[in-house]
């Protein structure tokens, strides 16, 4: 057996984990068996925008996968449709549904518990049938792992009466000792996780919704999740690292939509210094342009905050600070080519007009008491103090820093997965369809190289020492990714926040999209991008989000090569998109696209209703996809090859067994 020195050293290291030929053989057999299993079901979701309850329901019902498992387990003779509906609701919301059932019936008898436990075991067995026993055991709740393992590996078709008696004794004991409710909750959560093997979040966990912190907590409970950062995610990440302009943007956006839950309750951000400053500085200013926006539901239920006038003052105060801070960044970085967003200095305080993109506009509000004519981008001493306090609060929020670490550990700007290319926004292009080159830290990048450069900069920003130019410049680039002219996450010439607040002329607020959005409609462009990123140009697809798919518009573009899964999960977009989000589901048989419709979750739990989802088949695979056909399988196959080489080394005497 001819082995290089380097290869022999590697096999020696590998032999420490597998010290005998028997152990190597066992592992090879195990891995080869895994390669023949069906691939797990993957779910792709984008643009959650902090809509926690809706996102959670989509996860719990796995875009209809749980209900499909129930239908596969039971015939109409075994269970009525109403009973299936109740079982599905119990799996989605076990704790809440148990409470509702007890409220309706007083108590639940042994017959109900016995039947329900056995039904749940059948559904769980179906949901976990693709996986090895080892993988299922690792996913089991610790307290019931042994019992669930015993129940899952029993079939009523078994001829052994002793085995049947054993299983029924387990179920009886669970009920007898008062653990049935806890067991129902545990096995229901196992089913929820089992029907989603991999979860891909294609950007924008954060935005105006008030539950982003809860979404992040939920994602951290999943073992196999990746995130392709969106523009809102990058903004919050930069804010968590203490970047002032990003902090101001996060606060302004939250305050505008009355989202104080994420800031104060979720992350413990102290808004008192900002509030006091706003009350003092804008005491006599009604700030009518800055009254918070209320959702349709809040308006219908008259759940407006009593202190809208105070909120408006805080909203204006942080908006003015934001525009100043952004101007400072743009003056520091002419290489961003965003001088068109430097307009404070053009303001005429006598005529109350301002010049933007070469046009003069009347200002709807010209009361800016902290604006300095000599340097309109300089913060007042009071504004400086406020921002120092806010930055301290963001950097020292334990929950926020935990979420930031998770985003860094599990996220990237793009990902190639099983031949598919995932990214949130766009690949910047020129008008002629060629890739756009941007200067990043003195070097020009386009396409994949550009996204790789930004990936690197975000990592640098996370570990570079504070108060260094390296950290400051890296954080400034993260802010640029939020709104920059050629940012792959923004995809717009400008974000017209200032114009929407202060300019009456709607044409001033028009946001021109990157040429990418025109070119990506063509299949040739999609194939070119897939090739650029090393994805599969023959069977691969681009999965993206960011731009809501309008009602009547197809989310599948470029002859099936591009799938946009931004379905408007935020309530304010439901009327635009005609739904409340998309989920792309890739199982071992086909690729499915589900468009979800709004649901009252409290009523759904009570009445055993489920979210209405329109499901279409995007692609049927020519044969069932196995583990060996996907990226994980290729990694396993390489592992098997290494182990076979180690086995040969043992047998040839090149390496001596350790046992």
Residue spans for each PLM region:
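Feature recognizes metal-dependent phosphohydrolase scaffolds
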Residues: 1-659
């Amino acid at each position: 057996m001819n082995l290089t020195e380097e290869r022999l050293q590697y096999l020696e290291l590998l032999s420490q984990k597998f010290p005998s030929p028997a152990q190597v053989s066992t592992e090879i057999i195990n891995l080869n068996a895994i390669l023949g299993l069906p691939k797990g079901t993957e779910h792709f979701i984008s643009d959650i925008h902090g809509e926690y309850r809706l996102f959670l329901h989509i996860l719990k019902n796995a875009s209809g996968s749980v209900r499909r498992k129930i239908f596969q387990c039971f015939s109409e003779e075994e269970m009525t449709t109403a009973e299936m509906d109740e079982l599905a609701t119990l799996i989605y919301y076990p704790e809440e549904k148990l409470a509702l059932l007890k409220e309706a019936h007083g108590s639940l008898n042994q017959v109900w518990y016995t039947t329900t436990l056995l039904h749940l075991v059948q559904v769980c067995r179906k949901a976990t049938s693709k996986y090895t026993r080892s993988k299922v055991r690792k996913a089991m709740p610790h307290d019931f792992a042994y019992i669930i393992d015993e129940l899952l590996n029993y079939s009523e078709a078994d001829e052994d009466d002793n085995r049947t008696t054993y299983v029924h004794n387990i179920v009886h004991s669970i009920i007898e000792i008062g653990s049935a409710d806890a067991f129902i909750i545990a096995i229901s959560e196992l089913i929820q996780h089992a029907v989603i093997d991999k979860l891909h979040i294609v950007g924008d966990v954060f935005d105006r919704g008030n539950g982003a912190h809860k979404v992040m907590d939920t994602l951290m409970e999943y073992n196999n999740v990746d995130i392709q950062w969106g523009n809102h995610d990058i903004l919050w990440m930069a804010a968590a690292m203490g970047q002032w302009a990003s902090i101001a943007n996060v606060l302004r956006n939250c305050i505008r939509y009355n989202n104080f839950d994420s800031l104060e309750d979720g992350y413990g951000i102290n808004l008192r210094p900002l509030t006091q400053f706003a009350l003092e500085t804008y005491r006599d200013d009604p700030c009518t342009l800055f009254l918070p926006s209320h959702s349709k539901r809040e308006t219908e239920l008259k759940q407006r905050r009593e202190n809208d006038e105070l909120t408006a003052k805080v909203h204006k105060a942080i908006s003015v600070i934001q525009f100043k801070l952004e101007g400072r960044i743009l003056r520091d970085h002419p290489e961003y080519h965003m001088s068109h967003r430097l307009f404070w200095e053009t303001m005429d305080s006598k005529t109350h007009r301002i010049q933007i993109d070469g046009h003069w506009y009347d200002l709807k509000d010209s009361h800016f008491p902290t604006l300095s004519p000599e340097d309109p981008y300089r913060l007042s001493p009071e504004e400086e103090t406020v921002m120092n306090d806010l930055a301290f609060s963001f950097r020292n929020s334990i929950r926020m820093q935990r979420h930031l670490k998770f985003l860094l550990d599990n996220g990237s700007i793009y990902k190639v997965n099983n031949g598919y290319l995932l990214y949130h926004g766009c690949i910047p292009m020129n008008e002629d369809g060629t890739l756009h080159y941007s200067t990043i830290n003195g070097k020009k990048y386009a396409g994949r190289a550009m996204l790789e450069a930004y990936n690197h900069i975000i990592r640098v920003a996370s570990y570079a020492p504070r108060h260094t130019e390296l950290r400051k410049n890296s954080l400034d680039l993260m802010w640029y990714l939020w709104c920059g002219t050629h940012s792959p996450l923004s995809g717009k010439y400008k974000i017209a926040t200032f114009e929407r607040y202060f300019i009456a002329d709607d044409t001033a607020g028009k946001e021109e999209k990157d040429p990418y959005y025109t070119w990506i409609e063509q299949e040739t462009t999609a194939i070119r991008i897939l090739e650029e990123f090393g994805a599969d140009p023959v069977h691969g697809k681009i999965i993206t989000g960011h731009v809501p798919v309008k009602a009547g518009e197809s989310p599948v573009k470029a002859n099936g090569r591009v799938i946009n899964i931004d379905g408007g999960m935020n309530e304010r977009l439901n009327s635009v998109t005609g739904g409340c989000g998309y989920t792309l589901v890739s199982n071992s048989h086909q690729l499915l696209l589900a468009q979800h419709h709004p649901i009252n979750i409290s009523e759904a739990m009570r009445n055993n209703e489920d979210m209405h989802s329109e499901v279409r088949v995007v692609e049927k695979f020519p044969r069932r996809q196995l583990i060996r056909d996907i990226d994980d399988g290729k990694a396993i196959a390489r592992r098997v090859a290494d182990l076979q080489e180690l086995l040969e080394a043992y047998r040839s005497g090149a390496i001596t067994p350790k046992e």
